[in-house]
Swiss-Prot record:
Protein's UniProt keywords contain Coiled coil: no
Self-association and partners: Homodimer.
NCBIfam families, A to Z: PRK12346.1, talAB
Function of the protein: Transaldolase is important for the balance of metabolites in the pentose-phosphate pathway.
Pathway as given in its UniProt record: Carbohydrate degradation; pentose phosphate pathway; D-glyceraldehyde 3-phosphate and beta-D-fructose 6-phosphate from D-ribose 5-phosphate and D-xylulose 5-phosphate (non-oxidative stage): step 2/3
Gene3D superfamilies per the UniProt record, alphabetical: Aldolase class I
Keyword Cytoplasm: yes
Residues of the active site: K124 (schiff-base intermediate with substrate)
Compartments reported by the entry: Cytoplasm
Keywords, sorted A to Z: Cytoplasm, Pentose shunt, Schiff base, Transferase
PANTHER family per record: TRANSALDOLASE
This protein's name: Transaldolase
């Protein structure tokens, strides 16, 4: 029997959640996703040293060098993956719609200067109200977006309503919150709060005919991945890709468009309702804030690393 990674690829598009070229080449994913944390890690790799030096020598600010490196690493990844790479807008812009739009267009411009068409890039934006509005504008201009740091059903409904190309609902970080804030410390995969969340979002999208791609993200174990087999896409770390590859057990499809469970009413919220819904969800509020702070911290780490090399 083939390994579980190959079986999973029959049901879901597998995406590599890394900037490590060697790992991407080994596991042969469709796409790859990056974020400030992964870029900071990748920029310190010996193999990327020439890209770092080129970015520093060809730009006149650390901010510009960061953008150049993000795109340069994206270009290297696109030499290997047949699909797309996700490149993230500076998380410090998470509450600024216009600045997010401008940064997204700038990143796409850098890719086009490097000979990469916008069809091979997804712009990552945090799933704040402002980020979702930025995606709505960008999608209408033909720039596809990946809405990340998504923890609530309200966020998912708003992203679909805005016409986002893809969402990245987080699984493991939801599990982390429940383990830290409730008495229950262990969950079977199908009862995992992150798995339950993504399953509901997937079913909602299929029931209402949304084309927005559901890409489960942030996994803590292979059980979560197996419980979401059939999700449109799954972005997976090299460690978990390796564990799936080493396992020759049977993997069955769980999610299908045809069997989307009980009917879920359509949810359309204006800004006030969206903000209230998410404020009522302590897990989503805390994890979104924490996620933005974490990405900002690693963006600053990347900037400081570049300053040390300048």
């Amino acid at each position: 029997m083939t390994n579980k990674l190959e079986q999973l690829k029959q049901y879901s598009d597998v995406v590599a959640d890394t900037g490590d070229i060697e790992a991407i080449a080994r596991y042969k994913p469709l796409d790859a996703t990056t974020n400030p944390s992964l870029l900071y890690k990748a920029a310190q790799m010996e193999q990327y040293a020439p890209l770092v030096q080129d970015a520093l020598s060809s730009t006149d600010s650390i901010e510009a060098a960061c953008d150049k490196i993000a795109v340069a690493i994206g270009c290297e990844i696109l030499k290997i993956v047949p699909g797309r790479v996700s490149t993230e807008v500076d998380a410090r812009l998470s509450f600024n719609t216009n600045a997010s739009i401008e940064k997204a267009k700038h990143l796409i411009g850098l890719y086009e200067e490097a000979g990469i068409s916008k069809e091979r890039v997804l712009i990552k934006l945090a799933s704040t109200w402002e980020g979702i509005r930025a995606a709505e504008v960008l999608e209408k201009e033909g720039i596809n977006c990946n809405l990340t740091l998504l923890f609530s059903f309200s966020q998912a409904a708003a992203c679909a309503d805005a016409g986002a190309f893809l969402i990245s609902p987080f699984v493991g970080r939801i599990l982390d919150w429940y383990k830290a804030n409730t008495d229950q410390k262990e969950y079977a995969p199908m009862e995992d709060p992150g798995v339950v969340s993504v399953t509901r979002i997937y079913n909602y999208y299929k029931q209402h005919g949304y084309n927005t791609v559901v890409m489960g993200a942030s996994f803590r174990n292979t059980g979560e991945l197996e419980a979401l087999a059939g999700c449109d896409r799954l972005t997976i770390s090299p460690q978990l890709l390796g564990e799936l590859e080493a396992d020759t057990g049977e993997l069955k499809r769980v999610l299908t468009p045809e069997n989307s469970g009980e009917a879920i009413a359509k949810l359309i919220e204006d800004e006030a309702a969206f903000r209230f819904s998410n404020n009522e969800d302590a897990m989503a509020t805390e994890k979104l804030s924490q996620g933005i702070r974490g990405f900002v911290a690693d963006q600053v780490n990347l900037e400081n690393f570049l300053k040390s090399k300048a």
